Amino acid sequence: MTNWGLGRTVRAVEKRKLTLGHSPDPDDAFMFYGLAKGLVDDGGFDFEHILQDIQTLNERASRGELDITAISIHAYAYICGKYALLPSGASMGDGYGPMLVAREAFSKEEIASLRIAVPGTM
């Protein structure tokens, strides 16, 4: 509390700091730009933007290190006891996301029987 010689005491409002993890990729940059640049109401919070690749964010989420974070949807099965999914903010779509790379072409039916290597540990 402070008194600026006005004859009354004014309580200083301190913003609550929250860590917000997301990737530096263009889709996340677009989603968080307004918040990062102070162009939208922050709701009285002070967000510390943590920019890291999605695997690192998955690992940090598994340890509960960040208040809010982007994760891969697969990782949610491992961290659902620590975090809740928000109703918006997903970055998914047809033709977007992981690609299957092979030396030769395969049909969808053939792909179902193949062993596929996936990056990351989750």
PLM feature segments, named:
Residues M31-G44:
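Ligand-binding cleft/hinge of the Venus flytrap
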Residues D53-Q55, G64-A77:
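Beta->alpha turn/N-cap motifs
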